[in-house]
Amino acid sequence: MTNFNARRNLVNGKRIKWAIKTIGAIAAAAATLAAPVQAKEWKTVTVALEGGYAPWNLTLPGGKLGGFEPELLANVCGRIKVQCNMVAQDWDGMIPGLQAGKFDVLMDAISITPEREKILLFSRPYAATPATFAVTDTKIIPKAAPGAPAVKLTGDANADKPTVDALRKQLKGKTIGIQSGTVYTKFINDSFKDIASIRVYKTSPERDLDLVAGRIDASFDDVTYYAANIEKKENASIVLAGPKLGGPIWGPGEGLAFRKQDADLKAKFDAAIGAALADGTVKKLADKWFKTDVTP
């Protein structure tokens, strides 16, 4: 469990996001793996965030980045005494930019998955959140029950079949909107593309516009993303629908992403994140931005 203007797992909507769109990006990752490891004195670190996946990260009036992740980043960077410079970057350019040395760290509600770990190093998770469907017509999927615990999906098709089959019946013949390149994109395609139309969007806000306008029937994203964004006036007709879906299918949670050779930098952030989890800083920021505890 993190472009909108979006984003979410790379996230993690949950608005967690992931896309390696070109062979060039993969080649760059391979070249990075082969490069010799050299010690580096980290005094300044450039961190890429989308700046459009509220409340994880967003662009404030005046252009400054705010949200859960920028505030957490400021805290952990202070702990390791490193100057962290935040820059806004669309999701699709994050991985290539990291591998090219444009950024040192990615922080965008990126879900940690085995596939991503093949080319990236991840910090320990600083959050873990479930996902949900959203609709404007609760005849399609009933409104989510307040306070209901998340249904845990394992990623095993047989084990997850009862939950997925119930949703397939409700979404048969419908159009589902999903942001491109997220951990949720694969789930939606694998589970529903044979019975529903899947429409992919570059950002979550673009998808939400189509949901409100009736151009799609349902969307899927991180619970924390929707909990914040359905409060906006323009999204007043959107409601969370069906069960919250969590569990191992999304991986251990959201983490920072690094180049493979930067294990020393990862170690610094791991220690700082651990301290922020232990002293309640993460929970405090989560309560502020998500109105719920997302500590892993």
Q: Which role fits each region the language model picked out?
A:
Residues 33-39:
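Sec/Tat signal peptide C-region and signal peptidase I cleavage site
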